[in-house]
Amino acid sequence: MPTELSDITIQSVLPCDYSLFKNNLRVSRLPESRFVFSPKEEINCQSLLQGPELKTALDNLNFIHKQKFEHQFRHGYWKLHPHPHHQHDSIIPASWIHDTPHMKLVFHRLQNLPDGDLLLENDPKNNVGYFISGGIAGIVSRTCTAPLDRLKVMLISDTGSKPSPKYPFATLLHTTKVLWNRNGIRSFFVGNGINVLKVMPESSIKFGTYEAMKRVLGISSSSENHSPLYSYLAGGMAGSVAQMFIYPVDTLKFRIQCSDLSRGQHGKSIILSNAKELYKSVGIRGYYRGVLVGILGMFPYSATDLGTFEGLKRTWIGILASRDNVDPQDVKLPNGLVMAFGALSGSTGATIVFPLNVIRTRLQTQGTSAHPATYDGFIDCFYKTTKNEGFRGLYKGLSPNLLKVAPSVAISYLVYENCKKWLGLE
């Protein structure tokens, strides 16, 4: 497929020349019942839809997208040839670009013209779709990796032993054995219920906000010349917004995971008892212990994770598009690559900010049976951790964290990217 169309080819698809086409495209919302054609223009519109260029493209769409495309084409054509008594602005939505090769290239060509921009509708349903996709991705990925998350929290909270430089996995194996002896397989899923309640809105807000910030910063899947910094900035802001919303649930989750199951509490009872205990001891501010540390850690993590994934994805799509001589938007990344890019970006971000996460987690879990120590704040926690355990203590739990993060983020991106496809999102 050529990278751009000639003027003759575009003219064969569009019912007018460039300037007239662009001058008549404005943002508006108008139901089909408001389209009023003269008999002659109604025939002309139908002829264009049945013409060889558009008919071939429409035949490649499913029924729903075909109906939507025909509706929007009639809307656009109506603006070019309106009834004298019905002068309105028209709308050309982003759905026109959906997997229709000729029209996709037409729009890309028009958007790059120096004398004006082509305005595309921002469909609100698409915005909701990103949040839904993010929520589903979070639930699936976090449930699959719940045992590793439990191990990570237990290791971070344990201040009684120093990591062994000779046998870095010895502590991990010991903790696994301790958890198994406590309550069998159930011990590895303690806190998973609240984990899901936490991760669903967190992942939903993170991905939804990320897509929104990309649009604000002018980043789209078809833009090739934007600075990579924008992707990292959008990712960092998205993660910070999500962190602010779910931080109280995050604190409660960590405290539950550090609870002693020997008291016979399970399910709702353990959630309610921990919530009441925390509120009685320090009030509502107890739920926000370490929130600034959390945001300081989340911004670089989310920026690295989302920004790196976006960069790897865009780079590889460009390579495949050049190799196969196709438009980049026609390239579909294999699921294996999506998971590999997700695992790499997530692991990189997690390693960079892990010391901050250790401090944050200890501030959140202080005073529990698994972590009885208490701190006066971030600096005090940092000082006591490095004094008692050395700087290696700041990376305590990194091994199970990476074992959890790599598959978790890989699964998350896999589900998210496929959900976007299923919902017809870019």
Swiss-Prot record:
Repeat positions for Solcar: 125-216, 226-315, 334-422
Sections of the chain in a coiled coil: none
UniProt xrefs under InterPro entries: Mit_carrier, Mitochondrial_sb/sol_carrier, Mt_carrier_dom_sf
Regions that span the bilayer: 130-151, 193-213, 229-249, 290-310, 336-356, 394-415
Gene3D superfamilies in UniProt: Mitochondrial carrier domain (1.50.40.10)
GO biological process annotation, one example: ATP transport
Molecular-function GO term, any one: ATP:phosphate antiporter activity
Membrane topology per record: Multi-pass membrane protein
Compartment list: Mitochondrion inner membrane
SUPFAM superfamilies listed in its UniProt record: Mitochondrial carrier
Entry keywords, A to Z: Membrane, Mitochondrion, Mitochondrion inner membrane, Repeat, Transmembrane, Transmembrane helix, Transport
Pfam families, per the entry: Mito_carr
Entry annotated with the keyword Transmembrane: yes
Predominant localisation class: mitochondrion
Superkingdom of this protein's organism: Eukaryota
One term under GO cellular component: mitochondrial inner membrane
Family: Belongs to the mitochondrial carrier (TC 2.A.29) family.
PANTHER family (UniProt xref): SOLUTE CARRIER FAMILY 25
Protein name (record): Uncharacterized mitochondrial carrier C12D12.05c
Organism of derivation: Schizosaccharomyces pombe (strain 972 / ATCC 24843)
